[in-house]
Structures are given as structure tokens and as C-alpha cells.
């Protein structure tokens, strides 16, 4: 009999209950006990949703991040919070998001509070984790309370639970040494704590533990491979059964290593690594379980169940009880329940599967394998009809768009003149001071903005009333910026709910969900649009709003657009054509908007590519192909403008050392990047690579409520000036200010502008 299980379930709740609960707690509107009760209720509900599984995950729920949870389980707290006492949950949030100075005790780090932990992308997804911090003298100590509490809850609910933990080698690999020490040197101190954790779970009657080691799908050198052998040899003596889980890619040169590790089962992502299944069957010891991730855990399209059974049935005959079935990865990356989508186009809806529907698909596959296809004939027939409907739909294919793609040539992405010539023309037109100040685009999405949008979408506010409300918010943003004496202004994006969804709503080839939320980090959720067909732009999308904002000020007003690569990487993308083709389609559509903004007199146009790095394949050998079409797509979008129009781009959560040449090849006049959490470490790339254009290193962390001091910002910019000529530096926050409050934004920007004025006097 095939065993079904799941690697992880979305933790935010079908209606984002966790998000709202966290925000109430952070604002002091609810108690710690109320937040903990909400977590328990969500876990209870999610285990109920997974009741048909043979094994349900435990420990996949986190109040902020599963990697941060593992750091606390291992007793690895950053030194700056180790002296704080009180409830562990407050320390947890100190690490996750920082804390504004509320007492003399907390006035400890930069910005008048506790510096938040560094945050970066979880592999090639749009989820973010808090980076573990290591020092040569780091020690570990077990705190199993979180897992034991959840295990008690699961037992009380009658759940056959499988605890999920991050493996020791991946944990070290994901972290960062805060000194010159080697992370792997900590492995001997870390392994006994893992062993103690497994012993603790064994004593509680746990049979299986899922231990995630996703770095096995990346390129590992000999030292890291040996770390796997060392780690699992040390854990082999435990009486508990280990399911080693890999996902997000192929094992390739790590396949033999993974198959040889002394564990009881191995999970493989059969969406990305289906071709490796046969090799694993040959290499795995005869008694070992092979868990096959046959349902895509990262996209929302229905699985072709009949096609899946065609290759799973021979495998089931060969492996028998050793075959387990699961999604390819945790379902954290997809929305919770398609049944909530009452307004989604019925035809498109029939092509989709969210987390609960993916578990239904898993059940159909297992039933067919265990009892025969006849037992689920109706479900298989309905699935086949949906797959065929999508394949044949004329809504998916647009001959006009395909013809435009065929006409793309090498000249389409080139500016008329090189940067040095453009810069002099832009300087004459814009007349900016040294260290010009700007923001990244968005200002706080206030309760009034959200209420107006909600009433407009519900039909309680007509279009004229909505436009009046948004214009008032834009005017407020402009007046605040002028009062702050910023140099290049933005309109604040009051009319935009999300930087990708806003554009997707206005492009043909996109569809939108009501409740298709996924977690990005902490309480931050995104609702990716659904790219189901060929992309085109029926009409201008932003010109009216930007032109209105420009009419309110003599200062330059940035046109704000999301770039094609980011729109692609932050969407649920069709899987019936190469991603590069969809990206080129987006590039042509956004290019039309860029040219319309220029015609409207907009002098500065920002094209955000926040997610450029996120699309990089996990293996470097595949980077060049991705970067070629990603950079070309940006250039097609941006480079049709005149020399005196200044093109900005923004990137966040990015490390630049290894892709700096490609970023330079984008040829944006100004690039703004996130650097504050890494204390300008990202600028190390510029020690050896002479970046030719202008750059704005982010000077304060917008993900934290902490207010940066003027001196702190001056210090960061002086570090930047050691690498980048001062005449090519801009001063700006790390990212957009959408998630902050005006009460935080005003003092932070006041200090930022004051710092820029100080720099103009100090740095020649």
C-alpha cells in the first residue's frame, strides 16, 4: 500500500488569520495568550484539513519563520538578544523584526532598538527566512518545547504526526558567520543537540521524523558533502526513523550521496527531478522508503493525474509498500483553498488546484495505486476534461502577441547612447544636488486607503469617489515629501494593492483570486496573479496617476513600474511554455507603458526588479541562460526612451557579488538596492567590479519599526563612498514603505534627508 504524507501546510490561514493576529499583537491590541491560542486553533484546523493523509506534518507551523523556529529549538539566539529575559515569544519577535526602543534595556543596537535578523530568500522562492547567525564560540542547547507542545496537541486530536525539522547541514549552510569562523566547524557541537532532539521525540512515541536537507539539490563542494556523511553517521544510532527530504530541484551529482546516507527514507521532488527516480530506485538500499513528490507544491495548476499514474503505476509495482506519495515540497508556497474563490472565472478556476485540492489529488493518486483506477474513475475523468480544456482554450493563445515576440531583435534593448553621455543630459534636465534623496516608491497603505479600496471593490463607492480618495492620498504623499525636502518624489502608490497584482489586473492573459494569499515573510502575505495566457496591454496603466502627481510639484516625479522579471517571478506562471517566452511578452507590454510615461513628460521612470535574483536556478551551471533572457527582458522594457530620461531600477534581498556583471548589463541609469541589514556588506561586490552607473544603497531597514538615526545613516553612506564615487551615490531607504506607519516614516525620512545634507557638507 502506498503511504501518503505532506511536507508542510500553509500556516497563514485561509483568510490570513495569522497575519491579522500577529499585527494585533504587535500593536498591543491583543495579548500573548490570545496569539498563542490563535496558533493552536490554526494548527487544529490544518490537521483536520489533512485528516486523510497517512502522516501529517508537525512543526511546520511558525509564528514568523520555520528557520527562526529551528534556531530557537537549537538555542542559537543572536548575542544581542541573549540578555533579554521574559517570554521567549518576545525574544523571537525581537530577532525577527527588531523592536523600537521602549525602555532603556532595549536601547541596545543601531536605530534605537534591537537590530532585526538578516532576512533573505528561501532558495528560489518568494518566501524569506531569518538567517541564523554564527560565531566561532557559538554553542547550542536544546529547547524542544515548541515541538513537544505541538505534538501534545496533535496527539489529543488523534493526528498521526510526522515532526518536520530542518536538517543540521542545511541549517549551517543557510546561516552566516558573523566573524571569520567556518560554519562547518560548528557541526561537532550541533550534532549532539540534534541527537538529543531525536531522542526526545522518540521518548514521546514518534515513529517518523522528516528532516529537510534541500541543499542537496545545489552544487556542494567536497567539504559540505563530507558534512552530510558525518552528520548522518552520528544520527544513525537513534531509534527513530528519518525521512530525508529534498526539494526544489534535481540531486544530480549529489544523487549517490543522498541515496547512501543512513536514513530510513528519501523524498525527491519528482516535478523537477522525475528523470532521477529510476536511478534512485536502483541506488537506494532494498529496505528504504522512496517518497515521490508527484504533485507540484509550488504552482497552482491541476496535476494531469492520468499522466502521473502512467509512470507511478510501474513504480508502485516495483516498490510496493516502500513507495510514499507527497507534494513536491511544502504547500507553504500555494494558497489554501480554491473553494473560497467564488468570483474567479469558472473556466480558469477549473484548471487550478490550491493546497487542499492538491491533497485531494494526492488521495486520488494513492487510491488509484492501491485499489485501481476504477475506484476513482469519475475523479480521473473530471481531471482529464480540465486538462484538455486548458490545452485547447483560445484564451491561452494570442497570435498577435506571438507575432510580436517573433519580431524581437538585438537592437530593441539598446539605449541610443552610453551611460556617460546620458548622465550629462539627465543632470542638466534634473538639476539634482549631490547625494540626491528619494524613496523606493510606496508610502503607508493606511486604514483609509484600504477602506476606500474595499468599498470600491464591494460596489459601495463609485469610481469617481474612489479616484477622488486616491488623488487625496497622492496629494498627501507629495506634500509630505516636499515638507521633508526629498529631491525626487514618488506618488506613493495609494491606488495599488500589490506591485504585481496591480499590473496583472490591467494586462490581458492574467486572472486574479480573492483569497490566493501566500506568505512572503512574517505577517507579510502576497496574492500572486495567475499568468494563464499570452500577455498584452490593452491601455495605459499608470500614466493618469503619475501625471496627476507631477502636476502637484515642480520636483521630478518618478513613474513607478514593476519590471517583467519580477512580475513573472511573483506570479503563478503558466507551465505550458518556457518562462522566457512569458517574460518577453511582459517586457513588450511594460515597454509600451514606459514610452507612454515619457510622452506624458515623466523625467524619471523606475522599473522595479526586486525579484531578479530570485529566478536564478539553484545550480550555477544554469545561471547564464536565465540571466541572458532576464537581462534582455529588462533592456527591452527600459531602453526605448530618450537619453535625458533617467531609468531607475530597484532590487531587494539581493546579493550582488556573483551577478554584478549582469546587473551592470541591464544598463539602468540608477540602481537602488537593499543593504542596511547586511551593514553594507552587499557593496563588497564593488571592491573588484567597477559599477559604471549610479547607485542608491538602502540606508535603513523598512522591515523593522526601528527609526534610523542621522549618524547611523551618515556612517553607512560613508562606507558606501569608500567603494562608489560620491557623485554617483543616492540616499534612499531599503525598500518601499507600504507596510510602515506614517508615524515611523516621517522621523525616519527626516533623519535620512538630514544625513544627506550632512554628507554634502562633509564629502567632497
UniProtKB/Swiss-Prot annotation:
Q: Which GO terms describe its molecular function?
A: 5-methyltetrahydropteroyltriglutamate-homocysteine S-methyltransferase activity; zinc ion binding
Q: Where does 5-methyltetrahydropteroyltri-L-glutamate bind?
A: 16-19, 121, 524-525, 570, 614
In which residues is L-methionine bound?
440-442, 493, 608
BP-aspect Gene Ontology terms: methionine biosynthetic process; methylation
Cofactor annotation remark: Binds 1 zinc ion per subunit.
Reaction catalysed by this enzyme: 5-methyltetrahydropteroyltri-L-glutamate + L-homocysteine = tetrahydropteroyltri-L-glutamate + L-methionine
Name of this chain's protein: 5-methyltetrahydropteroyltriglutamate--homocysteine methyltransferase
Q: State the taxonomy lineage.
A: Bacteria, Pseudomonadati, Pseudomonadota, Betaproteobacteria, Burkholderiales
* Gene name linked to the record: metE
Amino acid at each position: 500500500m502506498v503511504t501518503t504524507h505532506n511536507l508542510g501546510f500553509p500556516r497563514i490561514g485561509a483568510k490570513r488569520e495569522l497575519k491579522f493576529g500577529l499585527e494585533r499583537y504587535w500593536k498591543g491590541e491583543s495579548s500573548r495568550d490570545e496569539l498563542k491560542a490563535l496558533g493552536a486553533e490554526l494548527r487544529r484546523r490544518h490537521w483536520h484539513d489533512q485528516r486523510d493523509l497517512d502522516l501529517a506534518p508537525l512543526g511546520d507551523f511558525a509564528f514568523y519563520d520555520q528557520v527562526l523556529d529551528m534556531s530557537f529549538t537549537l538555542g542559537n539566539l543572536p548575542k544581542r538578544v541573549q540578555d533579554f529575559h521574559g517570554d521567549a515569544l518576545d525574544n523571537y519577535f525581537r530577532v525577527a523584526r527588531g523592536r523600537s526602543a521602549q525602555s532603556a534595556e532595549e536601547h541596545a543596537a543601531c536605530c534605537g532598538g534591537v537590530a532585526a535578523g538578516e532576512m533573505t530568500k528561501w532558495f528560489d522562492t518568494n518566501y524569506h527566512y531569518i538567517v541564523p547567525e554564527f560565531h566561532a564560540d557559538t554553542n547550542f542547547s536544546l529547547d524542544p518545547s515548541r515541538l513537544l507542545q505541538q505534538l501534545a496537541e496533535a496527539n489529543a486530536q488523534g493526528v498521526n504526526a510526522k515532526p518536520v525539522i530542518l536538517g543540521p547541514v542545511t541549517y549551517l549552510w543557510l546561516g552566516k558567520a558573523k566573524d571569520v569562523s567556518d560554519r562547518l566547524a560548528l557541526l561537532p557541537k550541533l550534532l549532539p543537540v540534534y541527537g538529543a532532539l531525536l531522542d526526545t521525540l522518540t521518548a514521546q512515541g514518534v515513529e517518523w521524523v522528516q528532516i529537510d536537507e534541500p541543499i542537496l539539490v545545489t552544487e556542494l563542494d567536497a567539504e559540505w558533502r563530507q558534512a552530510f556523511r558525518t552528520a548522518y553517521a552520528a544520527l544513525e544510532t537513534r531509534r527513530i526513523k528519518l525521512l530525508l527530504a529534498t526539494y526544489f530541484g534535481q540531486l544530480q551529482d549529489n544523487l549517490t550521496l543522498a541515496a547512501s546516507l543512513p536514513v530510513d527514507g528519501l523524498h525527491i521532488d519528482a516535478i523537477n527531478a522525475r528523470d532521477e527516480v529510476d536511478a534512485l530506485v536502483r541506488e537506494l538500499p532494498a529496505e528504504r522508503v522512496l517518497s515521490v513528490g508527484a504533485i507540484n507544491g509550488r504552482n497552482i495548476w491541476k496535476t494531469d493525474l492520468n499522466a502521473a499514474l502512467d509512470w507511478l503505476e510501474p513504480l508502485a509495482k516495483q516498490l510496493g509498500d516502500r513507495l510514499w506519495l507527497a507534494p513536491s515540497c511544502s504547500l507553504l508556497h500555494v494558497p489554501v483553498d480554491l473553494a473560497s474563490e467564488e468570483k474567479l472565472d469558472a473556466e480558469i478556476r477549473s484548471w487550478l488546484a490550491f493546497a487542499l485540492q492538491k491533497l485531494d489529488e494526492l488521495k486520488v493518486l494513492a487510491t488509484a495505486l492501491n485499489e485501481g483506477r476504477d475506484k476513482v474513475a469519475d475523479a480521473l475523468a473530471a481531471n482529464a476534461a480540465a486538462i484538455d480544456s486548458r490545452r485547447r482554450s483560445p484564451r491561452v493563445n494570442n497570435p498577435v502577441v506571438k507575432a510580436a515576440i517573433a519580431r524581437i531583435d538585438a537592437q530593441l534593448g539598446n539605449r541610443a547612447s552610453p551611460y556617460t553621455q546620458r548622465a550629462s543630459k539627465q543632470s542638466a534636465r534634473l538639476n539634482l544636488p549631490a547625494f540626491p534623496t528619494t524613496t523606493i516608491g510606496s508610502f503607508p497603505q493606511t486604514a483609509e486607503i484600504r477602506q476606500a479600496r474595499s468599498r470600491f471593490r464591494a460596489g459601495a463607492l463609485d469610481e469617481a469617489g474612489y479616484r477622488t480618495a486616491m488623488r487625496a492620498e497622492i496629494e498627501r504623499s507629495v506634500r509630505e515629501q516636499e515638507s521633508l525636502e526629498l529631491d525626487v518624489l514618488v506618488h506613493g502608490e495609494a491606488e495599488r494593492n500589490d506591485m504585481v497584482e496591480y499590473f496583472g489586473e490591467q494586462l490581458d492573459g492574467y486572472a486574479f483570486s480573492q483569497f490566493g494569499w501566500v506568505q512572503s515573510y512574517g505577517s507579510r502575505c502576497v496574492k500572486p496573479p495567475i499568468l494563464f495566457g499570452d500577455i498584452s496591454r490593452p491601455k495605459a496603466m499608470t500614466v493618469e496617476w503619475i501625471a496627476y502627481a507631477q502636476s502637484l510639484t515642480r520636483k521630478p516625479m518618478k513613474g513607478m513600474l514593476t519590471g517583467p522579471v519580477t512580475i513573472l517571478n511573483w506570479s503563478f506562471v503558466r507551465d505550458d511554455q518556457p518562462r522566457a517566452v512569458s517574460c518577453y511578452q511582459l517586457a513588450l507590454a511594460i515597454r509600451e507603458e514606459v514610452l507612454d510615461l515619457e510622452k506624458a513628460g515623466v523625467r524619471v521612470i523606475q522599473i522595479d526588479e526586486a525579484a531578479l535574483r530570485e529566478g536564478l536556478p539553484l545550480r550555477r551551471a544554469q545561471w547564464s541562460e536565465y540571466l541572458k533572457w532576464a537581462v534582455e527582458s529588462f533592456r527591452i522594457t527600459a531602453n526605448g526612451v530618450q537619453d535625458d530620461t533617467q531609468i531607475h531600477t530597484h532590487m531587494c534581498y539581493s546579493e550582488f557579488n556573483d551577478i554584478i556583471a549582469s546587473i551592470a548589463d541591464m544598463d539602468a541609469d540608477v540602481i537602488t538596492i537593499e543593504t542596511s541589514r547586511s551593514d553594507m556588506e552587499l557593496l563588497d561586490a564593488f571592491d573588484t567590479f567597477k559599477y559604471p552607473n549610479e547607485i542608491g544603497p538602502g540606508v535603513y531597514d523598512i522591515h523593522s519599526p526601528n527609526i534610523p538615526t542621522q549618524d547611523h545613516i551618515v556612517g553607512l553612506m560613508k562606507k558606501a563612498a569608500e567603494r562608489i564615487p560620491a557623485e554617483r551615490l543616492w540616499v534612499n531607504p531599503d525598500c518601499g514603505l507600504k507596510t510602515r506607519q506614517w508615524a515611523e516614516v516621517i522621523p525616519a525620512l527626516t533623519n535620512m534627508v538630514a544625513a544627506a545634507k550632512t554628507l554634502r557638507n562633509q564629502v567632497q
